[in-house]
């Protein structure tokens, strides 16, 4: 199995377009210390030829350009992207669908709840019916988006997308609006969980024994944005478990048998983004890799 992290940042990317926090400032002025990053997306392949795109970020055109294995290879219209899977309906995971509209056939997969949110917005009708098939997938329903590559979706604690929040919103609920994906090919297993509000016993059992885990690395501490002075929301309020602190993911997953551990979906205020920082050193000493755009894994 081949995995390419196309985009490793959370919503807005790094640097965010209007942010002058210290980390965004370093990303502009000293990219050797803080690598710029695009928004959350990965691609997975069983054969290195046909690819499953998981989440379509607003930066998808640039991401595909930056990775030659994703370029058209034949005829006047072609893409090695054969299927797209959504793990939630967040803007940074669905806005890129508007770019993937140029008459290219593929199948769009997601839970019924996630696809319903897409179907309810007519702007996504630019993905022409009859060209892009929309296929709802049930929880724990194993399916093959590509030959030799199987995927099973499972609920993780989360919340509805920001643009669907109302007075009934529940943070930490396990529904089909936020899911993880267990991906298998050639006897190897990858768990991809870019959004997770807390680590539960059920989640630990689900991912035990995987060869690699790509996990929600949005915030280091629950109050990262407050500490940086750029926002008032906690990680919990946004539906993201912190790396460190009470119930932090590093400690919560420490005893779980996992091959490679990689943090993805990293917010611009997270100090682990700074190369060589004490926070980065601490996370790496705990056995985790901080993802960057273009990071590839062969499993």
UniProtKB/Swiss-Prot annotation:
InterPro entries assigned: Metallo-B-lactamas, PQQ_synth_PqqB, RibonucZ/Hydroxyglut_hydro
Q: Name the family the entry cites.
A: Belongs to the PqqB family.
Annotated pathway: Cofactor biosynthesis; pyrroloquinoline quinone biosynthesis
Protein name in the entry? Coenzyme PQQ synthesis protein B
In UniProt terms, what function does this protein have?
A: May be involved in the transport of PQQ or its precursor to the periplasm.
Database matches in Pfam families: Lactamase_B_2
| Biological processes, Gene Ontology terms | pyrroloquinoline quinone biosynthetic process
Keywords for this entry?
PQQ biosynthesis, Transport
Q: Which Gene3D superfamilies match?
A: Ribonuclease Z/Hydroxyacylglutathione hydrolase-like
